[in-house]
Structures are given as structure tokens and as C-alpha cells.
């Protein structure tokens, strides 16, 4: 975030960040309220030095103690003037993100969520002289710990992986470098196939968004809810073969490996499990079989790879 005073007088304002933490299952978050409202947990570091930067950080650790080894972190590249982690405290009873109570009152309540709906919000009070400019980096990230290194002390999560993550992006210069690298990555991917027409919307759809969605499909398959991790339904044999047609020109090496993974689940008679697990590379007849067009799509995907 870059803020510049283009006026002729000093300006005094406050900036708020606001995120709502998922409790690790987006679908369940929206319906299992009698359970979810009892599980939320956070830790807050109002001021901490990471590298050469003073920062503030909020850690979302719901179910970390009970059965998880991961947590989320929201941080800002300065020592914040206030924070909130309780949604009701920040927004207000019957309030709305369109006009949060804390913003309306120009304050923060330094609330600590214990159950209910954990959020992350920082308040930064800013003073700008005429022509003065200030920059802030807001970060949201994810960290994991091995089971034998979950805790820093009793009840306090091990934050070392979070510190390493935050130090990579906690200055405007580091942020600019990371953003440039991300732009180079996508420019390289998307430059493999370019359409030039008079219809700029068509160009944007074909050259950017369609190819981007194909890459998302490669990374996530046709996942939903908690299937992203490769559990439950897994990846579809037919789906994955069809998806190859969209991204084989972008990442042919990865497409080749995907073909090998898919083919490894095929039987000697040519039939196949309808789904397979990407983590184990094994199919499961309990979750579907007998889809006779499955192996036909492997031929189409392999042919597309050979042509590429």
C-alpha cells in the first residue's frame, strides 16, 4: 500500500486491514456453527522485529493444539497502532464490513478471539506532510511445523517458519522483487500462445484468463472443498486427461508427468479406475469404476503432448 499526500497541508488518517480466517474447511465453515463458534484461537504479537523491520503479526491457530500442525499469519511491515481478532468486536453487533464499528469510531479494541469468528485487523495511524509518501506491506501466509516442533513454549506456537516467510516480503523492496519474479513467471507461461485480434476482450480472454484457468485446473484438478489435499474423491481419470488439452502447451514437462501418473493406474485390459489419488498414485474402485470412455481420453491427451 502506497499513500502520498498530494495536498498543501499535513494529513492525518488511519488505515485498517481486515481478513476473515477460514477454519480450514470453507464449506463446513458456513453451516456447522454450533461447533465452529467454539474452536477459534489466535495469538498476537503487537510489535516484533523480523530482520531489520518492526512488524505486527496475528496468528490464526484454530485446532492447532488438537489436531493440526499448521497455522495462518497476517502481518504488516510496521508496528501497528491497534489490532482486532474478534469479528464482532471489529464490526460490531449486527454490523457490516461496509461500516465496521472500529472504523466508525476511529479506534481498535485489541480484541483476542476465543471461539466465535477469528479475524485479522490492524490499524495504522499515519501522518503525512505535503508531498510525503509512505509504503506498507500487508502479508497473509501459511506455515507448518513438524509434529516434534509444534510449540515454542507451553501453549505458544513455534513461529520460526512464519518468521522466515515474513522476512521474505517485509519491505517494499522485497515485495517489488517478489512481484517482478511473479510477473516474469506468468509472462513466460502465457507467452507460449498469443492471439492478436481486433477484439481486445477476446485477446484478454484467450491470452490471459483462459490459460490462467487451465493452469489452476492443472494445480487443483477439479477440486472442491477439502479435496484439494488429494483425499476424499481424489482426481478424476477422465477429467485429468481432458484437462491436459488445456495446459500441455504451457508446461509440457509437467504434462508428461501427469500422463505417466494417469497411465500408471490403468489395467492391462485398458480399463481404469475412474478416480485416483495424486498422493499415492493409486486408484480406488470404491469411489467409482466402469466409466468406459476413461481410457479413450488418455489417447487424446497423449496425442496432444506428442504434437506439442
Region spans (language model):
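Substrate-binding groove/exosite segments of carbohydrate-active enzymes
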Residues: 115-118, 132, 187-308
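Short Pro-Gly-centered flexible turn/kink motifs
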Residues: 11, 126-144
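Beta-strand-rich interaction surfaces with strong enrichment in secreted/lumenal proteins
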Residues: 109-113, 123-128
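Polysaccharide-binding surfaces and accessory modules of carbohydrate-active proteins
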Residues: 2-105, 122, 147-187
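Hydrophobic beta-strand core residues of beta-sandwich domains
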Residues: 5-9, 128-130, 234
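Amphipathic alpha-helical scaffolding segments
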Residues: 17-20, 142-143, 260-265
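Short, positively charged
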Residues: 104-108, 218
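A generic structural motif
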Residues: 3-8, 142-144, 249, 289
